[in-house]
Design a protein with these regions (language model features):
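Bacterial N-terminal signal peptides that target proteins for export
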Residues: 3-15
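Cysteine endopeptidase catalytic domains of the caspase/legumain-like
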Residues: 2, 26-303
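Bacterial N-terminal signal peptides
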Residues: 14-24
């Protein structure tokens, strides 16, 4: 073999070795996708300054806490925070995010924001209420001629996106959804110190007919959801039961959603894959926290 042939062979081996090293990383990154929404500064929306709106919370802190942890686990990140997290932007982002999902992907969706009971108009809820996420530009109350709830994202609408994603990633993939909101909370209470309580959500339902909200008492900690042979399995973590309030907690001088805090704490050592055992650990940690004695997380899964 001549010198040139030896050089070509050496080059081929080097290129092959390099590809063997970097290709798994490309596949790993492409196979793990995360989309996060975190809203803190609801009061900064000047377009809603003339109405009684939502109190500020600390949803952006949750996103800032989780993103580095997810990146370390190989996830590509898409996020919307504060004024970026309008209803239109969330919808467009969920659509574009779902279009990127591929067979076998592990998908993580996270929502840290207010939540609100929303009057059910299609009759699919036995108690007459849907649950809705509250984007940055959603009003708290119905206003004739101005706002009819179009910026709320109901659980029915969210489920449409989830079904699309589950179909795209297929049975070889998996979908996680973390909802650190609340649909039965009251309002902000106290000053920001160790003894204060920041509550997400409201106990006032959104209703065009002025219907009074009465929460359904469901004490199940684990709920079975739809399963299909052509869909990815799904696991949904919710911060509390439908009749409870979702309290933020303070750690190292910062406020976080309690569910987000313990999801991050758990994922610092647990692998985020198709094994959902880590979600049970999150539930255990929250139940052990004396600050959350009146709050019980809920796990919904197709497994």
């Amino acid at each position: 073999m001549g010198i040139i042939d030896k050089q070509k062979t050496t080059l081929r081996i080097a290129v092959l070795g390099l590809l063997m090293v970097i290709l798994p990383f490309f596949g790993y990154s492409q196979g793990k996708r995360a989309f996060l929404v975190g809203i803190s500064n609801y009061s900064s929306n000047q377009q809603l300054a003339d109405v009684k709106g939502w109190n500020d919370i600390h949803g952006e802190n949750d996103v800032n806490l989780l993103v580095p942890t997810l990146i370390k686990q190989g996830f590509s990140i898409q996020k919307l925070c504060n004024r970026e997290a309008t209803a239109n932007n969330i919808r467009k982002s969920l659509t574009s995010f779902s279009e990127k999902c591929k067979s076998g992907d592990i998908v993580y969706l996270h929502f840290s924001c207010h939540g609100q009971p929303f009057e059910d108009y299609d009759g699919d809820e036995s108690d007459g209420w849907d649950e809705a996420l509250v984007p940055f530009d959603a009003l708290k109350e119905y206003q004739q001629g101005r706002y009819s709830g179009e910026n709320h994202i109901t659980d029915d609408e969210l489920n449409t996106y989830l079904k699309t994603i589950r179909n795209r990633v297929g049975p070889k993939g998996f979908v996680y959804v973390v909802i650190d909101a609340c649909h039965a909370g009251s309002s902000y209470r106290g000053d920001e110190n160790e003894d204060s309580v920041v509550i997400r959500g409201t106990d006032k339902g959104f209703s065009k007919s002025n219907k009074q909200y009465a929460p359904r008492i469901d004490k199940r900690g684990k709920i079975k959801v739809e399963k299909s042979a052509n869909m990815a399995n799904i696991c949904i973590l919710e911060a509390c039961r439908s009749y409870q309030v979702n309290s933020e907690i303070c750690a190292d001088g910062k406020y976080y959603g309690s569910l987000s805090f313990y999801v991050n704490k758990t994922l610092l050592s647990a692998k985020l894959d198709k094994n959902i055992s880590w979600t049970e650990r999150v539930s255990q940690l929250m139940n052990q926290d004396t600050r959350l004695v009146r709050q019980n997380p809920v796990i919904e899964t197709s497994l």
